[in-house]
Regions:
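Alpha-helix N-cap/loop-to-helix initiation residues
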Residues: 85, 117-118, 147, 202
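Ligand-binding cleft/hinge of the Venus flytrap
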Residues: 129-133
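Conserved coil-to-alpha-helix start sites within the AMP-binding
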Residues: 113-128
């Protein structure tokens, strides 16, 4: 696909031809995909006008646009056509047909992603309606991320179907499950299934949520891996979940396979529509056709690839039989590299937090350095944690923690449109820790500072 897509983009996309010219690439001399320069949001999408990145230089060839938020909070526009979404619909069909058996069970699908032009809600609503149009006995409800409306829909309609599928960001859907339990919802009676996206979650989290919902953790809880740029790129299958659960129980094998103590999301993908590459340094790129073609697009997600048989054979050598599953390769993903953390599906950028710490009532007793990360509390709920470095001699007080937390919350909501729309209001205030200057754990002197941590 890369060479065919490359030649087509050269011939039909004005911005891509200019992109190659600026990189001193003669497209007629390119015979090896490795010679094609990597495309990024910074060197391509933010450089060339939107219409010139579309085929024929025509934005009006798109059927719809979706929005995602960049580091400045200014939305990025992603044009789509119906043809672009066929590859995404195939991934949803694999989840609903193979995992949830929704082709043979009447299903109420409840879209819990934020609605509007935001990419998650648009894609999900379109994909699930497509399945209904294909003959699945499936009805879609789209309350968005309105907790009361979600529970009202489930309560009024859920009992009329064989099963209910909740689609949303993992921490938000867990909040729906927990709120329902508090209000007396008998989740097992609805035979719930969960289709999740936007976060890496632990197998302990999956087990906890499955137990509260009365769901099977292997077949009933599925993670989708996607980006605003190209939609769903891959999805968990019962095979990938079984392997991941085994690796969670064998951290020694996991660390050897993935080169990291963290357990990544593990999904399968179709190389005919989304062809991944592992770039030197342990990040991912992919090629995908669409209204805005992406040729060796470097998304900077940390991760890598495994051929199907290689990963299965390794499991067998360790005494674990993973069983059957799709004949598709695996991609594993840790998430964004050094620059962001994902929280309720929103990319939280250090630049946004910096502004909160630059307000006069905070800047006078902080250095401006911080570390942002997501943690799980004792109830496996996701928490946005910000460790802030105090100015030399400044004291850590409860009042200062509260002031910093509120300042960060206010600026995140103002600057980052994803954060404002995706994160529930009662989860938007971060947990702030105040550490002394040059704290050895978070702010060691003489070391290049990292503003995010996994």
């Amino acid at each position: 696909m890369p060479m065919a897509l490359f030649r087509d983009a050269v011939a039909t996309v004005p911005a891509y031809a200019e992109f190659l010219r600026r990189n001193a690439i003669d497209p007629g001399r390119v015979a090896d995909p490795a010679a094609i320069p990597l495309m990024t949001k910074q060197n391509y999408h933010q450089v060339f006008p939107l219409s010139e990145r579309c085929r024929g230089g025509r934005l009006e060839s798109a059927d719809i646009v979706a929005l995602s938020s960049g580091s400045s909070g200014r939305p990025t526009v992603w044009p789509r056509s119906a043809a672009d979404e066929e590859a995404v619909f195939a991934r949803f069909e694999q989840v609903f047909a193979d995992g949830f058996r929704a082709a043979e069970r009447s299903t109420l699908a409840v879209v819990c992603f934020a609605l509007g032009n935001w990419v998650g809600g648009l894609y999900t609503l379109g994909a699930v309606r497509h399945l209904a149009g294909r003959g699945f006995p499936l009805t879609v409800a789209a309350p968005g991320n309105d907790l009361d409306e979600i529970l009202r829909v489930v309560g009024e309609l859920g009992g009329r179907y064989d099963q209910v599928v909740l689609l949303g960001y993992p921490p938000f859907v867990k909040g729906v499950i927990d709120a329902g339990i508090a209000r007396g919802v008998d989740w097992p009676a609805y035979h719930p299934m969960l289709a999740l996206a936007g976060e890496v979650f632990s197998e302990q989290w999956r087990e906890l949520v499955a137990s509260r919902a009365g769901a099977d953790p292997v077949t009933d809880i599925v993670s989708l891996y996607g980006t605003a740029d190209a939609g769903v790129l891959g999805n968990e299958t019962p095979l990938s979940v079984r392997i991941r659960r085994f690796l969670a129980s064998r951290p020694d094998v996991s660390a050897e396979l993935f080169g990291d103590a963290r357990l990544p999301t593990l999904v399968q993908y179709d190389p005919a529509t989304r062809l991944f590459e592992e770039i030197e340094g342990g990040t991912l790129a992919f090629s995908a056709d669409g209204t805005v073609p992406l040729v060796r697009y470097h998304i900077a997600d940390e991760g890598g690839l495994f051929p199907r048989e290689r990963l299965i054979e390794r499991c067998r050598r360790e005494g674990f039989e993973p069983g059957d599953g799709p004949d598709l390769p695996f991609v594993y993903v840790f998430g964004r590299s050094l620059f962001t953390v994902s929280y309720f599906g929103a990319n939280v950028y250090p630049e946004n937090i910096t502004v909160g710490l630059e307000r006069p009532d905070v800047a006078e007793w902080t250095t401006g350095r911080f570390v942002v990360r997501t943690l799980e509390d004792d109830d496996r709920d996701l928490v946005l944690n910000v460790v802030v470095e105090l100015a030399p001699g400044a004291e850590a007080t409860a009042d200062r923690r509260a002031v910093a937390a509120e300042s960060i919350r206010r600026e995140l909501g103002r600057l980052n449109s994803e954060f404002a729309h995706y994160v529930p209001a009662d989860r938007q205030t971060p947990d702030v820790e105040l550490r002394p200057a040059d704290d050895p754990e978070f702010f060691p002197p003489g070391v290049k500072h990292r503003y995010t941590r996994p």
